[in-house]
């Protein structure tokens, strides 16, 4: 049985001059560029209400794009009874607080045991929504808030809201190093040229913007609040590593333990045992896809980050006289 795909969005001004298939692949990252090219050639794409069958057609920015296509369902994912921490639910959306060690969508190395499998068990009708209603993702070991659409119209509207940057996502993190001020990282991100599971800053990458401000200083670590303007894969992790302040625990992007001089064995042990990136999606704000009402949710940092921060705070108090930046 074929699955119908209906998508609408507006081309960003930042995509001026891109090929149509390239622009659409950026706008709808859950679909490959080759699939999108096929849809264009098969006249399944409207640009400003007009059929367009030329993948090489250049976009100007601001065009209204609509896709109405079908995908042959090659895989039926299994519903699995995996607990979900549901923060909010109505007829159109779910907001969940994702724990660590939980992948969002099945893929290589993770064929099941994901948020998607849990959603299929919790709300079986969501099987009729592409990707079981998943609108955006969090990395396996990133915790926090995610919105899920329960209907196709809700998903279409939420995806469009993401493209228009109408959804606000804020994170808490702990970075390595003493940071003196907040700021913005505006650096494009693409897949790493040799490590295909990694991302990296690259001049030919997709635009990526991360804003950050300082919440608390420790001896050689900094607690941050960050806001995404875009949503590239591993964006916060890559951007913080790029400015030489990788996240604590992020072994992919350089966040290996770096205890301060004279740290207690207990604190060193706490640092070494923290085996994930210290990153939590703490706030989500959006306009409801049906009512249009602005809604906002908050999720406190999980216990492992609480313990990490408490240990850093205690270390700071024990060595306050040795800190040279006070």
Swiss-Prot record:
Its EC number is 5.4.99.23. The keyword Transcription regulation does not apply. Keywords: Cytoplasm, Isomerase, RNA-binding, rRNA processing. InterPro entries: PsdUridine_synth_cat_dom_sf, PsdUridine_synth_RluA-like_CS, PsdUridine_synth_RluC/D, PsdUridine_synth_RsuA/RluA, RluA_PseudoU_synthase, S4_RNA-bd, S4_RNA-bd_sf. Residues 183-203 are annotated as: Disordered. It is an enzyme of class 5 (isomerase). GO terms for cellular component: cytoplasm. It comes from the Bacteria. SUPFAM superfamilies: Alpha-L RNA-binding motif (SSF55174), Pseudouridine synthase (SSF55120). GO terms for biological process: enzyme-directed rRNA pseudouridine synthesis. Residues 18-91 form the S4 RNA-binding domain. Binds ObgE/YhbZ (AC Q8ZLS5). This is Ribosomal large subunit pseudouridine synthase D. It comes from Salmonella typhimurium (strain LT2 / SGSC1412 / ATCC 700720).
């Amino acid at each position: 049985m074929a699955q119908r795909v209906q998508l609408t969005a507006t081309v960003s001004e930042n995509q001026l001059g891109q090929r149509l298939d390239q622009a659409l692949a950026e706008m709808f990252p859950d679909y490959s560029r080759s699939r999108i090219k096929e849809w264009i050639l098969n006249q399944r794409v409207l640009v400003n209400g007009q059929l367009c069958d030329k993948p090489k057609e250049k976009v100007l920015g601001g065009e209204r794009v609509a896709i109405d296509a079908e995908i042959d369902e090659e895989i039926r994912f299994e519903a699995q009874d995996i607990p979900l921490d549901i923060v909010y639910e109505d007829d159109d959306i779910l907001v969940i607080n994702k724990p660590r060690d939980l992948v969002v969508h099945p893929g290589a190395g993770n064929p099941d045991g994901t948020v998607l499998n849990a959603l299929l068990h919790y709300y079986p009708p969501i099987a009729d929504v592409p990707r079981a209603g998943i609108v955006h993702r969090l990395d396996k070991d990133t915790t926090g808030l995610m919105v899920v659409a329960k209907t196709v119209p809700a998903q279409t509207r939420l995806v469009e809201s993401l493209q228009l940057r109408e959804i606000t996502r804020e994170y808490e993190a702990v970075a390595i190093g003493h940071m003196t001020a907040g700021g913005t990282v505006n650096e494009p991100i693409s897949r790493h040229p040799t490590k295909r599971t990694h991302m990296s800053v690259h001049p030919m990458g997709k635009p990526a913007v991360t804003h950050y401000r300082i919440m608390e200083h420790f001896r050689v670590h900094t607690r941050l609040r960050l806001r995404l303007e875009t949503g590239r894969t591993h964006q916060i992790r890559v951007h913080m590593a790029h400015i030489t302040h990788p996240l604590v625990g992020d072994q992919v992007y350089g966040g290996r333990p770096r205890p301060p001089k004279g740290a207690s064995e207990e604190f060193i042990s706490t640092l070494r045992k923290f085996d994930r990136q210290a990153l939590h999606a703490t706030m989500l704000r959006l306009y409801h896809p049906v009512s249009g009402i602005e809604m906002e949710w908050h999720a406190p940092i999980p216990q492992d980050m609480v313990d990490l921060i408490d240990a850093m705070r205690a270390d700071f108090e024990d060595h306050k006289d040795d800190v040279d930046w006070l």
